[in-house]
C-alpha cells in the first residue's frame, strides 16, 4: 500500500488502537492478541493501530514490538489495514518504522519523542529523517512535547511526500483551524484527544471528521453507533451517548493518572476479552473503580 492509498483510507471511517495482550507474568500473549484482532476486525474500523499509545507502545521491548506488529499484520491481512506506532528518539523511530515496513504494516503513526523539549527546527529534522527512511505513509502525532506549528507543517509537507496525516491531541482549536484551512486535502486529519468521542463534533466542524476510538476495544458496537450518528448529524444519538455513557466514563478515567489505558483494558476484561494486566508504571483499576466501570458498560447492553 503506497502513501496515497493510506491517506485515502484514513480520510474516512473510525480508527482504533487495540490494547496489547499480556499474560499474568506481564509477557506478550500472542494468541490472545490475535484473537482480539479477529474479534474487532469485522466491526468496521477503517484501520487499526498496532502498538499505539493504548497498546502500551512505551512499554514494549524491541523484540516485542516486532512480535506485536507481525501478529497484527498476519492476523488482519486482507481484512483491515494495520498502522504501527513508532517513536521515541529519532534513530529508534527510524528503526521501528523500517521494521514495521519490513513486516508489512501499511504505515506508521509517529509518536512523540521522549522527554526532551525540542525546537521547531529540531522537530522538522526528526520528522524528515523518519519519513525519508521509509516509503509508506507517515502520520504525525501532534501532542505533548512534539507539537508542530503551521509553518513547520508546511515545510514538512513540501519535503516529505509520504507525510500524509496529522493527528491532533493538543485540543488547540485555533491551531487546527489554521492547519485544516491552510493545508486543505494535502493531509488527512485525525482527532486524537482522550475519549475522542466527546470532542468529535467540534473536530468534525473543523474538517477533521475522523478520530481514533479507545472504547472500540470493549464496546465496538456502541463505538460504531456513535461514529455513524456523528457522520449523519444525528445529534440526538450522539448527545444521549455523551451524557449517559462518555461523561460518566471520563469521571472514572480521571480518578487516577494512567487510567486512560488501564480503563480500556479493564473494559475489555469486563466484556469477556481479557487482555491481562497493564505494565508498570501504569496500574490496574481498583476493585471499586472496576465495578463502577462494569455497571456503566452494562447500561449499553450486548455488544
Curated annotation (Swiss-Prot):
NCBIfam families reported for this sequence: KdgD, PRK03620.1
Protein name, per record: Probable 5-dehydro-4-deoxyglucarate dehydratase
Annotated TM spans: none
Keyword Oxidoreductase listed: no
Origin species: Acinetobacter baumannii (strain AB307-0294)
GO MF terms, alphabetically ordered: 4-hydroxy-tetrahydrodipicolinate synthase activity; 5-dehydro-4-deoxyglucarate dehydratase activity
Reaction catalysed by this enzyme: 5-dehydro-4-deoxy-D-glucarate + H(+) = 2,5-dioxopentanoate + CO2 + H2O
Pathway in which the depicted protein is active: Carbohydrate acid metabolism; D-glucarate degradation; 2,5-dioxopentanoate from D-glucarate: step 2/2
Similarity annotation: Belongs to the DapA family.
Keyword Ribosomal protein: no
Gene3D superfamilies xrefs: Aldolase class I
Any one Gene Ontology BP term: D-glucarate catabolic process
Keywords recorded for this protein, A-Z: Lyase
Xref: SMART domains: DHDPS (SM01130)
CDD domains, alphabetized: KDGDH (cd00951)
This enzyme's EC code(s): 4.2.1.41
